Structure formats: C-alpha cells, structure tokens
Amino acid sequence: MPCLKITLAYDGSNYAGWQVQPEAHGPTVQGEVAAALKRLTGEEITPVAAGRTDAGVHARGQVISFSTRARIPVERWPLALNSVLPADIAALEAVEVAPDFHARYCAKRKWYRYTIYNNRVPDVFCRRYSWHLRQPLDVIAMARAAAYLQGCHDFRSFCAAGSPVRHFERQVQQASVSQNGPFIYFDVIADGFLYHMVRIMVGTLVEIGRRRLVPEAIPAILAARSREKAGPTAPARGLCLERVEY
C-alpha cells in the first residue's frame, strides 16, 4: 500500500491544534485532513504529522504521512485534497515515500518562527499571526540572549509544567533574533521541541527585551531546570512551523 508524504500550510487560528483529542474544544487540523481523506478515498485514515502544533499555532511547512489504497496519481494529490479541504488548510506538495516513512519519527530537524509586532499602533491585518507589543524592545539584547539557547541543553526550564516527557535534552542548531521594521522574528531550528518550548523561549526573550532580565540570565535559567525561572508563555498566534527537514 503506497505511503504518501504531503506538505501542508494552515492558519491555525480556528483550530484546537493539530491532534484530534477527546477533550478538544473545536475542530482540529488532523480531523479536517482525515475527513478530507475519507471523502477522497472512502478510507478511515489517521494522518501523522511531523509537529503536533498547539491551538492557534500556524504552519507553512507541516509534513504529514499516511498510507492509502487510493489510485490517485501522486502529482494530483495536492489538487484533490485542496478541492475538499477548508480554505484555511492547503496541500502544497505530495511525494510517494518508503512504507516505513513516518512524518514525525523520521524528521531530523524542525524550524519554527515566532513573530512579534513591536509598535505603538496595532496592525489589524497581522493580529492573527503575531504578538503585538507596544513597549519598544531591546532587540540587540534579545539576540545576545538567543545565542545562549544554541547547543545541546536540558530545556526543562522551557517546558510547560505537567508535561509527561521524561527526557528534556534537545539539540538546538540555531536560535536567532532579527528585526525588519516593526517586526521582530525569533527563528529556532532543533532536532525536537518540548511542550510550549518555543513560546516560553519567546516569553523569556521578551522579558530581556523589556530589560527585566539580562541576556546572561539564560545559562542560569537553563541550569535551574525549573519552569518558574523562565519567562511567561508567549501567545500561540505568533508561532509558525516553517519547515521540516528529513
């Protein structure tokens, strides 16, 4: 049975995250994709995603995988899916892969970007995709702090309390802060992420940008291995899964 790897983009604003869960309040991206697949194939398919994005988080390069008996040519899959998916979910690319391919477990690294709109006046067209902060932030200090997040660390301080994860070590290949006009971007590439990890990183960097913490506080926060030592969790709406590499 052929296995397909499909790249998706979606606006997560109206979804209770990627994963279908009994307690989910509202539709999920996985649920919408599964419903679209059933319409196309008649099969009950549970697509697997590279990143199980939270409620309100977006994606430009989410990757899913699934097996199907459908005889749709691989190059026609994006067009077929887009004909039955909601307007805020789009299939971008499809390729056939080995039967043992798994979108999550085969991923080598993921790139997330968090967007802050740093301006006194809000931008109504960006409000769903950025965190609006009126107070000017010290971007240079934030960039210095981000560099300390690179490398292999125990990121327990940057994991939401109550996470069932046992192993907190992750390898961060890149963590950087850049600015383009009123937009401040935090880009992070890692082999994996803990629950709310990127959003807690951003909340901590904003505390540094507000000069409530110094950049050199990051090593101590990492060493503490305590969620209480890091900053608040940034809103979901500014976060986007940009790309998954295999």
Curated annotation (Swiss-Prot):
It is an enzyme of class 5 (isomerase). GO terms for biological process: tRNA pseudouridine synthesis. Homodimer. Belongs to the tRNA pseudouridine synthase TruA family. HAMAP family: TruA (MF_00171). Formation of pseudouridine at positions 38, 39 and 40 in the anticodon stem and loop of transfer RNAs. This is tRNA pseudouridine synthase A. It comes from Moorella thermoacetica (strain ATCC 39073 / JCM 9320).
